[in-house]
Amino acid sequence: MTITPQQLIALLPLLIVGLTVVVVMLGIAWRRDHFINATLTVIGLNLALLSLYFVGQAGPMDVTPLLRVDGYSMFYTGLVILASLATCTFAYPWLVGYPDNREEFYLLVLIATLGGILLASANHLASLFLGIELISLPLFGLVGYAYRQKRPLEAAIKYMLLSAAASSFLLFGMALLYAESGDLSLAGLGKSLQENMMHQPLVLAGMGMMIVGLGFKLSLVPFQLWTPDVYQGAPAPVSTFLATASKIAIFAVVMRLFLYAPAADNEALRMVLSIIAVCSILFGNLMAISQTNIKRLLGYSSIAHLGYLLVALIAVQTHQLSLETAGVYLAGYLFSSLGAFGVVSLMSSPYRGPDADSLFSYRGLFWHKPILSAVMTVMMLSLAGIPMTLGFIGKFFVIAMGVSAHLWWLTGAVVLGSAIGLYYYLRVTVSLFLSAPEALQRDTPNNWALTAGGVVVLISAALVLLLGVYPQPLITLVQMAQPMF
């Protein structure tokens, strides 16, 4: 097939990130310089982000049978690149004191970003699987990057073994669907499934196995057991990527899959998804209550947040508002998580081994670093869904969509989960303002707000507050980011 200039423009983010991977690889081979390779990575990701403007000018199109570039893919590509940029920014000071090779970290983040961009544009089960593997494989290395410590190594092994099992379920499910429908493209699959095939045992088994595989990647109950251990064990900048870019990219492709394949029309599958959503919301929130480790707490809370998003997924076939809900919620979740994990990254350094992730480390932070603790407070309030924050707008959309789609049980679970969530988010917030322990040593530099990581954290906090008060620009952007049919 011949590729036109228009199609090349549509693939610009993918091509630029791919080229950056090659450039950084050659840079590492030529000369090991942490600053140069980090700068090349950030320049490449910024160019990929800027190229989305030109992609928008080219208009929506099917570049190949595997990739569909439209407003929807551009929006989620933008979110993934922003998360990757933030990860690299937080990682730079964290890696400065790292005793081993530092440059490969950026290479792995770039390859995972490539997978995220591929997932955002995936229009075929083959590109879906390739994207998921491309985002998962570098994460094994990233999670265990501080391999001299026991925790990251243990987290990497757990994540690798369970991820391999989940991928095999996903692939087996795809094979069963292909055996029944004879098509791997999402549109062709949807067309086959609409012709009264949703009750075929092979199709139900295939969809069930795919839900198992994708449920693991999104850390939904009962496939969530790896989440708190991996979040706690992974270095703070890696936990940032795991919580944001990885989840957003995979949820975007699952949403597109459900748009075509009428899985939620089948009563049995709809019931299974509803049970998974309710269990994820309740389990995530209830388990987070007793946590004393902030990364572990955020890991459990991410299970609950994906449970809330599942409400939008269940209604995606019947309700136009569900796409808008997912977009607004994921944008709010991205900025809130970047801020929260960013503060943990700024508080941590590999000089003394483990990250500053114990809740005790944050006790009385306000009296030493008032602006940093104010940022953390804003992020916790946003994740809890308190009004005047972007998190509230996302929760409002989820509840409004649940009510208009008559999903009463799920809406009730969202309200109950949000009420439980208030307790542990406010627990973190209150600890910031308690009297500080005298013997506690903190690694955060006094000029943290002037560092690149500090700037990212402050911008995230500003966006959470500004879009919480005036969300119309984000809502307009999400409304423009509609998938092409």
Curated annotation (Swiss-Prot):
A Gene Ontology biological process noted in the UniProt record is:
ATP synthesis coupled electron transport
- Keyword annotations for this protein? Cell inner membrane, Cell membrane, Membrane, NAD, Quinone, Translocase, Transmembrane, Transmembrane helix, Transport, Ubiquinone
InterPro entries assigned to the protein according to its UniProt record, in alphabetical order: NADH-Q_OxRdtase_suN/2, ND/Mrp_TM
Subcellular location field? Cell inner membrane
Q: Which GO terms describe its cellular component?
A: plasma membrane
Q: Tell me the enzyme class.
A: translocase
Q: What main location does UniProt list?
A: membrane
Q: Which GO-annotated molecular functions does the record name?
A: NADH dehydrogenase (ubiquinone) activity; NADH:ubiquinone reductase (non-electrogenic) activity; quinone binding
Q: So where does this one cross the membrane?
A: 8-28, 35-55, 78-98, 104-124, 125-145, 159-179, 203-223, 235-255, 271-291, 297-317, 327-347, 374-394, 408-427, 449-469
Q: Which reaction does it catalyse?
A: a quinone + NADH + 5 H(+)(in) = a quinol + NAD(+) + 4 H(+)(out)
* Record-listed E.C. numbers: 7.1.1.-
According to Swiss-Prot or TrEMBL, what is its membrane topology? Multi-pass membrane protein
The UniProt similarity line reads: Belongs to the complex I subunit 2 family.
Q: Which PANTHER family match?
A: NADH DEHYDROGENASE
Q: How does it assemble?
A: NDH-1 is composed of 13 different subunits. Subunits NuoA, H, J, K, L, M, N constitute the membrane sector of the complex.
**HAMAP family, sorted:** NDH1_NuoN_1
What job does the chain carry out? NDH-1 shuttles electrons from NADH, via FMN and iron-sulfur (Fe-S) centers, to quinones in the respiratory chain. The immediate electron acceptor for the enzyme in this species is believed to be ubiquinone. Couples the redox reaction to proton translocation (for every two electrons transferred, four hydrogen ions are translocated across the cytoplasmic membrane), and thus conserves the redox energy in a proton gradient.
Protein name, per record: NADH-quinone oxidoreductase subunit N
Give the organism the record lists.
Serratia proteamaculans (strain 568)
What gene name is listed for this protein? nuoN
